[in-house]
């Protein structure tokens, strides 16, 4: 008989982070996967990061997660998206050598302390009654082996009753050539979880030797690539180029003439796909006024002959894929290595979860990744690390949930959106979803989260010490710049343009001026050069945003006050005067943990919030008296 503190099902991006996080905290953890050879597989595009997504990778890394370190080992084309805009919307992104990424992740996972990996298929899990509540008891494999555990994390990705479509061809699969998870889907139905259906897609893979690169636009990465991980010193792999081409009217004509043959137009038309990553068929249908759509040709590795054509996800038959591709410049003689396809799969209504990602129905059961209705490697990793941390922490009798607020992290924004609002389509993060994005930047994730992770043993002492040294240097440089006061006349002598208004300013204050940067003020303060690039950059960004932080920090304080006004889990909303039946039902279903969470539920009015506050204050005063 085998027993583990935490069992994780699925070896994708959510599963790897969940298993590693639980193990770091000290839980005896088991990761179960269909195939060890697919742990860390990049199922779709060979890239990590992007706008908002790159910040999530940094947040995962700040909590000692794996994704940032692994992509730094596999990066072959790095860039900062939105570099021309402010730091709050910078998006670190890196193309990966797909094979090196997977191999690096597998090496880490297979040698992780406290973590065992088992190659098996889980068909069912059992529950027991614990203090009048259903709790996880064990998982059962397809070979009828029983593995006992009180904490189970499901990270099934697109495998939960997954079905692949290529035109009219349909086959059960979670990924091309890999069997779906049918038994677990039936188990979730048995326990009355609210299930829905979503879909996503992937483009055909192309033979690099059949592409005419001479007619394509070369796109180089950053000359000095920036690592994702705060503990990575450099990017060591050679950096290679991507190439840009585009569809045209001939391409669109082929697609229009064959829309009736695409699975997305027929079998899948009622199943929601990612809104912000539409198929090429959907692009042509929705944006009929557009004459072309960009296609980025991305190498899948340094020694790979496969090209990933980003921008032409399709569910059309193979003959249509060929006909469409051969109208695109550079692809006139292209060979397809693997067909593009669409995959549909089950997901659960994430409003059935707490902010810890534990289910409300069954104690000890957690969901993370695409099973919660999200799309993207980064979103999955962010959920995985939170589920893993909470599953491990909850083994203790004095367990305090590890919850990241909307003001703490993009991960907090995502989870709060999911468990409060739910989703009817694949959810992805954007900077626009974060109210406090001036504070939630990709450059400061370690300053925001590493100490929080260290307090719950999710972060190593080595990383924490590095953070404290960095914080000390940031504080030192900031104080130096704040204590050097200079007049406009003195600044003019250094050719630094400011208004000649006679007002004395500190060097730190000067950084908020639009035409002044840290390099400019280095003329006055040589000591800046003694600090690391990361520290100098951090101080410069803080100086740039300083005037805007005053308002945002006040908003954050108001938000935190509402988040700290807790609503008891056993509250009877039907007993609160002034709440309509509809609002009572919504609140009873979602069970918001705080006034802040209740306020974000659609349909819950300001008057309803006031009624809840009055009720809470009355009962608090009654208890005191």
Curated annotation (Swiss-Prot):
The reply on keyword NAD is yes
Cross-referenced Pfam families: GIDA, GIDA_C_1st, SAM_GIDA_C
Q: Which Gene3D superfamilies match?
A: FAD/NAD(P)-binding domain (3.50.50.60), GidA associated domain, C-terminal subdomain (1.10.150.570), tRNA uridine 5-carboxymethylaminomethyl modification enzyme MnmG/GidA (1.10.10.1800)
Q: Where in the cell is it found?
A: Cytoplasm
List the keywords (alphabetical). Answer: Cytoplasm, FAD, Flavoprotein, NAD, tRNA processing
Residues annotated for FAD binding in this entry: 10-15, 122, 181, 370
Q: Which PANTHER family match?
A: GLUCOSE INHIBITED DIVISION PROTEIN A, PROTEIN MTO1 HOMOLOG, MITOCHONDRIAL
UniProt lists the family membership as follows: Belongs to the MnmG family.
What role is this protein assigned? NAD-binding protein involved in the addition of a carboxymethylaminomethyl (cmnm) group at the wobble position (U34) of certain tRNAs, forming tRNA-cmnm(5)s(2)U34.
Q: What is this protein called?
A: tRNA uridine 5-carboxymethylaminomethyl modification enzyme MnmG
* Organism of derivation: Ehrlichia canis (strain Jake)
């Amino acid at each position: 008989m085998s027993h583990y503190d935490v069992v994780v099902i699925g070896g994708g991006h959510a599963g790897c982070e969940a298993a590693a996080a639980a193990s770091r905290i000290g839980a005896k953890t088991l990761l179960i996967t269909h195939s060890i050879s697919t742990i860390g597989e990049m199922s779709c595009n060979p890239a990590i990061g992007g706008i908002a997504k790159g910040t999530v990778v940094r947040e995962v890394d700040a909590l000692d997660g794996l994704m940032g370190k692994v992509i730094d080992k596999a990066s072959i084309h790095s860039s900062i998206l939105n570099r021309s805009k402010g730091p709050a919307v910078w998006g670190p992104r890196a193309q990966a050598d797909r094979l090196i990424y997977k191999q690096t992740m597998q090496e880490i996972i297979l040698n992780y302390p406290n973590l065992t990996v088992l190659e098996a298929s889980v068909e069912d899990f059992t529950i027991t009654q614990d203090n009048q509540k259903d709790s996880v008891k064990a998982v059962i494999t397809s070979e009828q082996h029983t593995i006992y555990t009180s904490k189970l994390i499901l990270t099934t990705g697109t495998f939960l009753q997954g079905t692949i479509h290529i035109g009219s061809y349909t086959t059960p699969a979670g990924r091309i050539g890999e069997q779906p998870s049918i038994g677990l889907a039936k188990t979730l139905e048995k326990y009355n979880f609210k299930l829905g259906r979503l879909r996503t897609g992937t483009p055909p893979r192309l033979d690099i030797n059949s592409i005419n690169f001479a007619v394509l636009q070369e796109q180089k990465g950053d000359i000095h690539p920036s690592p994702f991980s705060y503990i990575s010193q450099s990017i060591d792999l050679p950096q290679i180029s991507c190439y840009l081409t585009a569809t045209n009217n001939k391409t669109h004509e082929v697609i229009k003439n064959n829309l009736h043959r695409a699975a997305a137009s027929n079998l899948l038309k009622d199943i929601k796909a990612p809104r912000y990553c539409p198929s090429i068929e959907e692009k042509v249908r929705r944006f009929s006024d557009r004459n072309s759509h960009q296609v980025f040709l991305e190498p899948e590795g340094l020694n790979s002959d496969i090209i990933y054509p980003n921008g032409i996800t399709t569910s059309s038959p193979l003959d249509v894929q060929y006909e469409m591709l051969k109208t695109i410049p550079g692809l006139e003689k292209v060979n397809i290595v693997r067909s593009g396809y669409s995959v549909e799969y089950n997901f659960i209504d994430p409003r059935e979860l707490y902010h810890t990602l534990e289910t409300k129905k069954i104690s000890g059961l957690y969901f993370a990744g695409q099973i919660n209705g999200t799309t993207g490697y980064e979103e999955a990793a962010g959920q995985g690390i939170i589920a893993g941390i909470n599953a491990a922490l909850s083994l203790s009798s004095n367990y305090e949930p590890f919850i990241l607020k909307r003001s703490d992290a993009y991960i907090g924004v995502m989870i709060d959106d999911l468990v409060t609002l739910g989703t009817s389509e694949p959810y992805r993060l954007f900077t626009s979803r974060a109210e406090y994005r001036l504070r939630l930047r990709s450059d400061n994730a370690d300053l925001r989260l590493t100490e929080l992770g260290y307090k719950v043993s999710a972060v190593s002492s080595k990383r924490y010490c590095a953070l404290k040294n960095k914080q000390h240097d940031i504080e030192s440089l900031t104080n130096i710049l704040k204590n050097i006061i200079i007049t406009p006349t003195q600044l003019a002598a250094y050719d630094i343009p400011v208004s000649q208004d006679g007002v004395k300013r500190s060097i730190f204050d000067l950084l908020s001026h639009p035409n002044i940067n840290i390099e400019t003020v280095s003329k006055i303060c040589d000591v800046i050069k003694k600090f690391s690039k990361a520290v100098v950059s951090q101080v410069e960004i803080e100086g740039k945003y300083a005037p805007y932080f005053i308002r945002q920090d006040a908003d954050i304080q108001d938000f935190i006050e509402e988040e700290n006004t807790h609503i008891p889990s056993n509250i009877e909303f039907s007993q609160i005067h002034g709440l309509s039946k509809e609002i009572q039902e919504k609140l009873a279903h979602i069970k918001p943990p705080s006034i802040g969470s209740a306020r974000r539920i659609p349909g819950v009015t300001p008057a309803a919030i006031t009624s809840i506050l009055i009720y809470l204050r009355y009962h608090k005063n009654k208890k005191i008296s």
